[in-house]
Amino acid sequence: MPINQKIPTWFAVPAVFAVLSVISYQTLIVPENLEGAKNVLTMAKTIPIPVAGPESIEFDPKGEGPYAAVVDGRILKWRGDDLGWVDFAYTSPHRGNCSKTEVVPTCGRPLGLTFEKKTGDLYICDGYLGLMKVGPEGGLAELIVDEAEGRKVMFANQGDIDEEEDVFYFNDSSDKYHFRDVFFVAVSGERSGRVIRYDKKTKEAKVIMDNLVCNNGLALNKDRSFLITCESGTSLVHRYWIKGPKAGTRDIFAKVPGYPDNIRLTSTGDFWIGLHCKKNLIGRLIVKYKWLGKLVEKTMKLEYVIAFINGFKPHGVAVKISGETGEVLELLEDKEGKTMKYVSEAYERDDGKLWFGSVYWPAVWVLDRK
């Protein structure tokens, strides 16, 4: 056979592998497109923060803030462009070896923040220590709940308060893992997540929902007749009825197009949910097949799991769902991650501004929609 006819054969094998690699990457790794999404998060203003991971943001009863729960165990308060971020509170007295970029368990890891309007107290879900509270002046938070029905609260995540009933509801995402291993909780299929009802008057902590897979965000609806909680791995939003003829029962309220984190109620009664990222095929397979999820848990470092699920391109996504039907009302994204990454929370203020937190990135963002 002439040499010029053999040359294509020499190139065939690497060419085929190259094509397969591109196809595999496009098929398995690239995040899925979100139909109807508005690529407007690129227009948000970035407010840098000196510590990574403002996972939850909150405003006090006076409207001041936001307050941000960050990776080194502190809650910081934004005092405007002139004063910047200042210390407000912290969840652990152990401050000596705390890192501004990585979780140190002894320092605590504050997550969901909720102010009680009538007292000014700030309730804090700490991913290592439990449910905590600090007064309006800040400082060291006190532990409120670290056990419910004989099981340790390992991963307090987000909560909400019914001020009329003096009851606080919060998620315990796992009784096996703490915050650092959140993605392993989501992909392993481990079902030990709970919703806990804490009665402030009797000091009783009671489990009202269980058998959940990494239940992450939680919020009460506008009339406090039900609460919703979302599972990060399955993308399901569960509803638990607190009042009315269905009280004590649960159902599926919605399914969102990504991996959900915190939930915030709007003044109109709808919900914003921060999405860590859009889905891709590799993420779907890991979550769907429990054996694969457990294999990933045992063999892969957490940072690699995060990279694969994000499609090696961190980006920003948030979804607004109806407070009545659960249907998707709005999808906002930063498709290329040019401005916003790893969105953990979307918080809508009455002035029309949307504030965003991030579980990993050292920034919060604000989008003026008026």
Curated annotation (Swiss-Prot):
Protein location: Vacuole
InterPro entries named in the record: 6-blade_b-propeller_TolB-like (IPR011042), Strictosidine_synth_cons-reg (IPR018119)
Endpoints of the signal sequence: 1-26
Protein species of origin: Arabidopsis thaliana
Keywords: Glycoprotein, Signal, Vacuole
Any one GO cellular component localisation term in the record: cytosol
Glycosylation sites: N97, N171
Family: Belongs to the strictosidine synthase family.
Annotated protein name in UniProt: Protein STRICTOSIDINE SYNTHASE-LIKE 9
Location (main, coarse): other
Gene: SSL9
Alphabetized Pfam families for the sequence: SSL_N (PF20067), Str_synth (PF03088)
